[in-house]
């Protein structure tokens, strides 16, 4: 198994490979820093299972916990710090979040980095005010408006409320989150390169996200509410923002010429880069994005045949400071019997060999046998 270089054209596979069907091995931090060097991630279970969870430590949680067991970000959203009590995850949640379209601000800045930074800070301040307005709307609601969360005592301290009470004193434990998308495309619009291509651009990009975190921290102190910065996942928003900006500004090479903006602070998936460098570039943002973050890498091959390589990637993520990491591996698909998983020269389900001709009768037999 070798590492995948992003942007390279993948060689043809022996069996039909579905790009949409990928197993994700999501690895959450679960060990204190003191034992990081002794961490050994065992992945032998991959042989029997298509999915396996593993745990490792990074520095993003240890300020709040004597970490023991698996700590979940709930797939990007992270609720930890609390200005109104203990920094726990139970009985709390994210109240709302708003995402800033960084590429649009960069296009409007016409290559001026100073103007762009001012725009980012100004829009971020607007987002804080918007989140405050949302909070006020939610805070004036009554317990009976939330029969499950409040009426059943799911939300922290809600068991002390009566049916007609406002929920303000309860939802203040929640988070109000500012997010961002398209850092890579924003840098291309400003400098002609993104943060995966140039160290100076990477330094500026980091300062941009750092300024967003400062806006959140300042708002937390000023309003005594839990404002946080999230590396927005934006699976749907990434395409919507791009379509809107292409309609307004036209096709801009490296910015609006694709069907999507790159999620948050990620290096573009189409850019050729080693997994190690990708981790190094994205890791510093995890500490800034205290409202949630994730980084992906992809391995091209059967991880069950080389668990040491898989383990090396996980350890590298841990040492780099990745707070939430995912390792994707391609999944093969046999169109005859419908088997999904790792396929070598022979399908483990029906025994069909690579390139073997199959009669129509045999196909019908296999599909009937496996209920396809």
Q: How would you describe each model-predicted region?
A:
Residues 53, 64-67, 105-110, 192-194, ...:
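Flexible loop/turn segments at secondary-structure boundaries
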Residues 8-12, 18-28, 140-165, 209, ...:
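A glycine-rich phosphate-binding loop feature that marks nucleotide/adenosyl-phosphate handling sites
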Residues 37-40, 52, 94, 114-117, ...:
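Conserved structured core elements
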Residues 62-74, 196-216:
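Short secondary-structure subsegments characteristic of cysteine-rich extracellular domains
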Residues 78-84, 249-282:
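Aromatic/basic-lined ligand-recognition segments
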Residues 75-181, 185-189, 194, 301, ...:
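Structured mid-domain segments that build the active-site/substrate or prosthetic-cofactor binding neighborhood
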Residues 1-74, 267-372:
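Autoprocessing domains of the Hint superfamily
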């Amino acid at each position: 198994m070798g590492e995948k270089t992003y942007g390279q054209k993948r060689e043809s596979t022996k069996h039909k490979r579905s790009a949409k069907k990928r197993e994700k091995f999501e690895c959450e931090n679960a060990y204190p820093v003191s034992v990081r060097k002794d961490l050994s991630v065992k992945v032998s279970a991959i042989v029997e299972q298509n999915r396996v969870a593993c745990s490792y430590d990074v520095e993003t949680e240890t300020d709040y916990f004597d970490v023991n067991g698996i700590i979940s970000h709930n797939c990007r959203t992270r609720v930890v710090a609390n200005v109104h009590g203990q920094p726990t995850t139970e009985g709390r949640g994210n109240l709302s979040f708003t995402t800033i379209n960084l590429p649009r601000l960069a296009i409007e800045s016409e290559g001026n980095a100073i103007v762009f930074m001012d725009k980012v800070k100004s829009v971020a301040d607007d987002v804080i005010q918007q989140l405050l307005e949302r909070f006020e709307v939610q805070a004036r609601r009554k317990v009976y408006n939330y029969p499950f969360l409040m009426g059943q005592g799911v939300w922290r301290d809600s068991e002390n409320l009566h049916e007609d009470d406002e929920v303000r004193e309860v939802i203040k434990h929640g988070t109000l989150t500012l997010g961002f998308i398209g850092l890579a495309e924003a840098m291309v619009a400003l400098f002609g390169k993104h943060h995966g291509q140039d160290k100076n651009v990477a330094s500026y990009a980091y300062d941009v996200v750092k300024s967003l975190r400062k806006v959140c921290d300042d708002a937390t102190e000023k309003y005594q509410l839990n404002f946080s910065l999230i590396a927005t996942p934006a699976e749907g928003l990434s395409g919507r923002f791009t379509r809107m900006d292409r309609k307004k500004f036209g096709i801009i090479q490296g910015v609006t010429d694709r069907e999507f903006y790159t999620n948050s602070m990620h290096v573009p998936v189409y850019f050729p880069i080693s997994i190690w460098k990708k981790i190094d570039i994205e890791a510093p943002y995890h500490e800034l994005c205290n409202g949630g973050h994730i980084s992906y890498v992809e391995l091209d091959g059967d991880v069950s045949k080389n668990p040491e390589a898989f383990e090396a990637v996980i350890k590298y993520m841990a040492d780099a400071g990745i707070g939430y990491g995912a390792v994707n591996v391609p999944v093969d698909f046999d169109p005859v019997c419908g088997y999904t998983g790792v396929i070598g020269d022979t399908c483990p389900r029906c025994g069909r060999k690579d390139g073997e001709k199959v009669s129509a009768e045999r196909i019908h037999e296999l599909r009937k046998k496996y209920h396809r």
